[in-house]
């Protein structure tokens, strides 16, 4: 495990560029956090009175208040159900006891349950009370996704596609770093990480939680997809900087672009950080330019649908800025040995999210 030289000067994450007009006040709806946690309790994922379990869930679910500042309670519940499911599944698949065979079984099983529900061949012959905690919660999630899309099934299908792409990227990302934990080519890392960061489904939540009136084909629009990829890259860079110390400490630096580039390019931290700052800023400029191209290319659509497109563009802005604010406070990323002044000295060990999950969850 590598360590950070604390005698070196601290750097600042304020060098990242975020347009001031993209920020939006945090969502004041918090009820979804406790209600979603209680659903997890009812399925057996969490224990009702376990403070560590609630701290874990809160550390996951509070991202909804940052990412979706305009959502009402019901919309927050949709987003929170998704976030709890993906974080639990991601953390569970990273457990040391998970063999390659178990990992493959899990991703295939939960893909099937999301598609077919109780008719999935994995659980169709099992009584509900005998299902595993994650089986039960997957059914809750599926129902919550279906309810608002009952008359627009293409929205449900689009979102399931985004979820599927994400959870099939978990294992390749872990494998890509190789046995030396720093052997992944940066191009391979960037390709897999763009999917694994999950922004396509984070933005795609709007396809089920919000009636935007955009046609289903919009989600395939190449300009829109390029905007989401640019945003993904910006978020990857920012999150990798915030989580740099924690990933070094946990021997996960092989998945961190700030670390990978130091190794591959044989450049000092400060030089790599400056280059990443410039790249992240260019991503913002690319998004701003593509916004204009997107609106111009869709000049033929109705005013109602255009309003939906504008809503989604603004939501992309809100997620980028919301991620900044959430990343700087979530115990999933921050670490007391951070080389950045904004998070240095903050101890996040009170939420041991890597170890609290029941090994019999699935």
Curated annotation (Swiss-Prot):
User: A Pfam family matched by this chain, by name?
Assistant: Terpene_syn_C_2
Task: Write the lineage as a comma-separated list.
Answer: Eukaryota, Amoebozoa, Evosea, Eumycetozoa, Dictyostelia
Return the broad EC class. lyase
UniProt similarity note: Belongs to the terpene synthase family.
Catalyzed reaction equations? (2E,6E)-farnesyl diphosphate = beta-maaliene + diphosphate; (2E,6E)-farnesyl diphosphate = aristolene + diphosphate; (2E,6E)-farnesyl diphosphate = calarene + diphosphate; (2E)-geranyl diphosphate = (E)-beta-ocimene + diphosphate
Q: Where is this motif: DDxx(x)D/E motif?
A: 90-95
Give UniProt keywords alphabetically. Answer: Lyase, Metal-binding
One example of the protein's molecular function in GO is:
terpene synthase activity
On whether Lipid metabolism is a keyword of this UniProt record, the answer is no
InterPro entries recorded: Isoprenoid_synthase_dom_sf (IPR008949), Terpene_cyclase-like_2 (IPR034686)
PANTHER family attached to this UniProt entry: TERPENE SYNTHASE, TERPENE SYNTHASE 1-RELATED
Organism, by scientific name, is Dictyostelium discoideum (Social amoeba)
Outline the inducing conditions: Expression is detectable but at low levels in vegetatively growing cells and increases during development induced by starvation. Expression is highest during mound formation (approximately 8-12 hours after induction), starts to decrease at the time of slug formation (approximately 16 hours after induction) and further decreases during culmination (from 18 to 24 hours after induction).
EC number assigned by the record: 4.2.3.-, 4.2.3.106, 4.2.3.15
Which Gene Ontology BP annotations are present? sesquiterpene biosynthetic process; sorocarp stalk development
Q: Could you tell me what this protein is called?
A: Terpene synthase 3
What is the role of this chain?
A: Terpene synthase that converts its substrate farnesyl diphosphate (FPP) into an unidentified sesquiterpene as a major product, as well as beta-maaliene, aristolene, calarene and 2 additional unidentified sesquiterpene as minor products. Is also able to convert geranyl diphosphate (GPP) into a mixture of monoterpenes including (Z)-beta-ocimene, (E)-beta-ocimene, allo-ocimene, linalool and beta-myrcene.
Residues spanned by motif NDxxSxxxD/E motif: 239-247
Metal-binding as a keyword of this entry, yes or no, is: yes
Domain comment quoted from the record: Contains several highly conserved motifs that are important for catalytic activity including the aspartate-rich 'DDxx(x)D/E' motif and the 'NDxxSxxxD/E' motif, both of which are involved in complexing metal ions to coordinate the binding of the isoprenyl diphosphate substrate in the active site.
């Amino acid at each position: 495990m590598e360590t950070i030289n604390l005698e070196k000067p601290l750097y600042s994450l304020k060098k990242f560029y975020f347009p001031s007009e993209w920020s939006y006040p945090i969502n004041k709806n918090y009820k979804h956090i406790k209600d979603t946690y209680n659903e997890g309790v009812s399925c057996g994922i969490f224990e009702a009175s376990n403070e560590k379990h609630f701290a874990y869930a809160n550390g996951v679910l509070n991202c909804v208040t940052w990412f979706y500042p305009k959502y009402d309670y019901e919309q927050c519940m949709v987003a929170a159900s998704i976030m709890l499911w993906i974080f639990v599944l991601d953390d569970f698949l990273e457990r040391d006891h998970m063999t390659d065979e178990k990992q493959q079984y899990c991703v295939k099983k939960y893909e099937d349950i999301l598609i077919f529900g109780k008719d999935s061949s994995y659980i169709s012959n099992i009584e509900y009370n005998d299902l595993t905690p994650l089986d039960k919660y997957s059914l809750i999630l599926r129902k919550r996704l279906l309810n608002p899309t009952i008359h627009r099934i293409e929205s449900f299908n689009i979102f399931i596609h985004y979820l599927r792409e994400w959870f099939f990227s978990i294992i390749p990302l872990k494998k890509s770093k190789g046995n030396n934990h720093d052997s992944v080519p940066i191009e391979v890392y960037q390709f897999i990480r763009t999917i694994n960061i999950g922004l396509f489904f984070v933005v795609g939540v709007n396809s089920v939680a919000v009636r935007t009136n955009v046609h289903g084909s919009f989600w395939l629009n190449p300009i829109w997809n390029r905007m989401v990829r640019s945003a993904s890259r910006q978020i990857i860079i920012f999150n990798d900087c915030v989580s740099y110390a924690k990933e070094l400490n946990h021997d996960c630096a092989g998945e961190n672009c700030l670390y990978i580039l130091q190794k591959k390019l044989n450049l000092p931290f400060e030089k790599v950080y400056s280059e990443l700052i410039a790249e992240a800023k260019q991503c913002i400029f690319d998004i701003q330019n593509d916004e204009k191209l997107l609106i111009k290319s869709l000049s033929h659509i109705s005013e109602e649908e255009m309003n939906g497109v504008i809503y989604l563009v603004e939501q992309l802005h809100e997620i980028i800025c919301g991620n900044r604010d959430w990343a700087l406070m979530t115990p999933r990323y921050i670490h007391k040995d951070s080389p950045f002044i904004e998070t240095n000295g903050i101890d996040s060990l009170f939420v041991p999210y890597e170890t609290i999950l029941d090994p019999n969850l699935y």
